[in-house]
Amino acid sequence: MSDVVKTVIGQRLDLYKLLELNYKDYKGNDDAATTHSLKKQYRKLSLRYHPDKNPGPEYIDRFHLLNLAITVLADPAKKAEYDQWVAQYLYPDNGLSEAEQTRREALVQKLNASERKVREDNQGGNVADIGKIQNYGEKLRRMAHFGLGFGDWRNLDEHISRATTNTIEDSTTDKEVCTLRAVFDFQSIENISDPNNLRRYMNEVFPEYMYDIDEIRYSSNNVYDGEEDIVVYIVLKDPIKTGRLYHQIKRNPPDAFVEIEPYISPKLFESFSKEIPLNDHVKNLLRGVPEVIDLD
């Protein structure tokens, strides 16, 4: 069983209900028409709940769950694994009437919500963690101010975990300046949606950067239907190596690359060309001139 299906089952998520669909209409259907219908519904809801339009935490959480749902249900193998669990635990054929089944589902959801609350209450927290989460929130607000996309919301939990465990510097500036936004031709790399395959491709094409690529993330807006290009964020460990890789791809892009750009556009800094002189107080501090304090 795939890791993403294990995650969904572990959280007892009803992916069909998240997509505002009836499980019975899709049970056992894995054909192209079913997949197309699921993706169409996902696109409609993703526009409604996208964090770029609705920055509230409830929208962020819902958007993350929508991405989780389409990742599982649009893949026939993952959908088959998930449907087997759904048929056994969420919607078992137990001879209950429709009204009785509805009441059973409500009780199960209430129990699951109660169990989640107990787990969350037992996890606790501390002031330092809250401070780091607030700093991460400030970062998201700055990105919204400059019109930057919010990146890969498919792995939102991973981003929050990183922001609350690393230093502020590690989770913001360094990561951003070392990130490249790459657009790939979907058909150019076999099973491009698998980060291991994409990393293997990068190692083959750019072996000199094999140990410099720190992470590979996927945009939440990707649609893995073979007809659209795929947006990927490539994070390196060193800003100098990031610049070298960027210029190397720009000069001689491999066939799989459609586009490559820095994650933070240099255009954002064009308005900072004006020189502003330092005031005398700051100049004295930089020169090491002692500051006179009036004690009267």
Curated annotation (Swiss-Prot):
Family membership: Belongs to the DnaJ family.
UniProt organism field: Candida glabrata (strain ATCC 2001 / BCRC 20586 / JCM 3761 / NBRC 0622 / NRRL Y-65 / CBS 138)
Assembly with partners or alone: Associated with the spliceosome.
PANTHER family attached to this UniProt entry: DNAJ HOMOLOG SUBFAMILY C MEMBER 17 (PTHR44313:SF1)
UniProt keyword terms in alphabetical order: Chaperone, Cytoplasm, mRNA processing, mRNA splicing, Nucleus, Spliceosome
GO biological process: spliceosomal complex disassembly
Chief location of this protein within or outside the cell: cytoplasm
Source organism phylogeny: Eukaryota, Fungi, Dikarya, Ascomycota, Saccharomycotina
InterPro entries registered for this protein in UniProt: DnaJ_domain, J_dom_sf, Pre-mRNA-splicing_ERAD
Compartment(s) of residence: Cytoplasm; Nucleus
PROSITE patterns assigned to the protein according to its UniProt record, in alphabetical order: DNAJ_2
A GO cellular component annotation in the UniProt record: cytoplasm
Name of the protein: Pre-mRNA-splicing factor CWC23
Domain of life: Eukaryota
Coiled coil regions, renumbered to chain: none
Gene designation per UniProt: CWC23
Function: Involved in pre-mRNA splicing. May be involved in endoplasmic reticulum-associated protein degradation (ERAD) and required for growth at low and high temperatures.
Domain J positions: 14-86
